[in-house]
UniProtKB/Swiss-Prot annotation:
One of its GO terms (cellular component) is plant-type vacuole. The keyword Transmembrane helix does not apply. This is Probable histone H2A variant 3. It comes from Arabidopsis thaliana (Mouse-ear cress). Residues 1-33 are annotated as: Disordered.
Length: 134
């Protein structure tokens, strides 16, 4: 008998069950950065879609997730205000459209069409003056 099994007990080495107690709970990069958006997923998507052959810095994912979270919060806040003005509890694509087109900076940033958003009401100034004279 070589005595290999007894050495661990005598030397006080942790057995398999003790190793689980010593492990720390993993902390996500999102919680480390104080974000709600998933930094790991953003990093993976940046790596797969970049032209740098998968080389993306760790902080690039954090910055990108922070920017996405900020823009989402901004749009949702404005859309929530629009839905509250219309006395509705649910945000619809129409409310998103009104919020984005109502803000000048968001309007220049998001130039795409929002499905189900409708159109923004607009009456030309010359038509308003013509009807006011009569």
């Amino acid at each position: 008998m070589s005595g290999k099994g007894a050495k661990g007990l005598i030397m006080g080495k942790p057995s398999g069950s003790d190793k689980d107690k010593d492990k720390k709970k993993p902390i996500t990069r999102s919680s480390r950065a104080g974000l709600q958006f998933p930094v790991g997923r953003v990093h993976r998507l940046l790596k797969t879609r970049s032209t740098a052959h998968g080389r993306v810095g760790a902080t690039a994912a954090v910055y990108t997730a922070a920017i996405l979270e900020y823009l989402t919060a901004e749009v949702l806040e404005l859309a929530g205000n629009a839905s509250k003005d219309l006395k509705v509890k649910r945000i619809s694509p129409r409310h998103l459209q009104l919020a984005i087109r109502g803000d000048e900076e968001l309007d220049t940033l998001i130039k795409g069409t929002i499905a189900g958003g409708g159109v923004i009401p607009h009456i030309h100034k010359s038509l308003i003056n013509k009807s006011a004279k009569e």
